Amino acid sequence: MKREDLQLYFIMGTSNVSHQEPLVVLEKALRAGITMFQLREKGPYALTGLAYEQFARQCQQLCQHYHVPFIVNDDVDLAVRLGADGVHIGQDDEQIAIARKKMANRILGVSVHSQEELQIAIDHHADYVGIGPIFATTSKSDAQPPCGTNFLQQASKLQPNLPIVAIGGINGINADIVFQAGADGVAVISALCESEDIEQTVSIFKSLNRIKR
């Protein structure tokens, strides 16, 4: 994984999109210039079983066409089965050590909320960590309270060689604050899923100093 792959990290599941077909939204985002994509299929109406796997493969094919890393959220076995570029897990998900073993040399991202969790991720050779929610978010029903940028600043100073992506309520207005705090990239859900003009929204993110393509 290249550090710059985190610069504009799009996360999406079918429940995050209401006004367009999810695959249409994904392709628009890919065409506009996102640098990484994570399939996060959650919620009461989330796809399951074969329907979920078929949708995952369609997302993967689009990412491959645009040469953008395809990451699966939580489901390590699905990531292995698909030959995904990586998997992202939380502290409450499958044990990080097991995920690292199954994913071999593919990308492993881990959500962290404290110095202790950060060290656990490092000890198990995570390729990057996700820190958040930085700001209030409605995209995750189980999201923790906003943590602001303090821990993000601490983590980036303590672990300057560890790629960090920030998530949670980030948009084109507040993203610059996150980059100044030390994030290598921003992960967004609503900012793109609810955008009326995805190309313009991506362009705003890319216009920031740290966003380059």
Curated annotation (Swiss-Prot):
Gene3D superfamilies for this protein: Aldolase class I
User: Is Transferase tagged as a keyword?
Assistant: yes
So which domain of life are we looking at?
Bacteria
Q: Name one GO biological process term.
A: thiamine biosynthetic process
- Cofactor(s) demanded: Mg(2+)
Kindly list the GO molecular function terms attached to this UniProt entry.
Answer: magnesium ion binding; thiamine-phosphate diphosphorylase activity
| Reactions the enzyme catalyzes | 2-[(2R,5Z)-2-carboxy-4-methylthiazol-5(2H)-ylidene]ethyl phosphate + 4-amino-2-methyl-5-(diphosphooxymethyl)pyrimidine + 2 H(+) = thiamine phosphate + CO2 + diphosphate; 2-(2-carboxy-4-methylthiazol-5-yl)ethyl phosphate + 4-amino-2-methyl-5-(diphosphooxymethyl)pyrimidine + 2 H(+) = thiamine phosphate + CO2 + diphosphate; 4-methyl-5-(2-phosphooxyethyl)-thiazole + 4-amino-2-methyl-5-(diphosphooxymethyl)pyrimidine + H(+) = thiamine phosphate + diphosphate
Q: Describe cofactor binding as the record notes it.
A: Binds 1 Mg(2+) ion per subunit.
- E.C. code: 2.5.1.3
Binding-site residues, Mg(2+): 74, 93
Residue numbers binding 4-amino-2-methyl-5-(diphosphooxymethyl)pyrimidine: 38-42, 73, 111, 140
Which key words are in the record? Magnesium, Metal-binding, Thiamine biosynthesis, Transferase
SUPFAM superfamilies from the UniProt entry: Thiamin phosphate synthase
Q: What is the recorded name of this protein?
A: Thiamine-phosphate synthase
Q: Which organism is it from?
A: Lysinibacillus sphaericus (strain C3-41)
